[in-house]
């Protein structure tokens, strides 16, 4: 993880929308740094998708987030979705 990185946010989003997106980014960070509860991660992703319904924008945000943090949204999502466990982490997914 890189120290002191910025989150890729769209300034046209409302405060609530930014909170939803940040919540998902936090879940991704938690996936890499400790572990996440699968259900909560997927709920957070669903809320993120309501704010960012476009696949293209999701990929761009994912690339920007990975460049600044070193964490892949795509990899985290795929590993959590594929896991049959209640709690999932990057090193045990």
Swiss-Prot record:
It comes from the Bacteria. InterPro entries: BH2638-like_sf (IPR023324), UPF0223 (IPR007920). Gene3D superfamilies: BH2638-like (1.10.220.80). Belongs to the UPF0223 family. This is UPF0223 protein llmg_0515. It comes from Lactococcus lactis subsp. cremoris (strain MG1363).
């Amino acid at each position: 993880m890189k120290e002191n990185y910025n989150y890729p946010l769209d300034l046209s989003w409302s405060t609530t929308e930014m909170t939803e997106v940040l919540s998902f980014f936090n879940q991704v960070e938690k996936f890499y740094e400790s572990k996440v509860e699968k259900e909560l991660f997927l709920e957070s992703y669903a809320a993120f998708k309501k704010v960012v319904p476009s696949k293209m924008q999701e990929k761009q945000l994912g690339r920007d987030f990975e460049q600044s943090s070193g964490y892949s949204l795509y990899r985290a999502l795929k590993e959590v979705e594929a896991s049959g466990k209640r709690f999932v982490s990057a090193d045990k997914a």
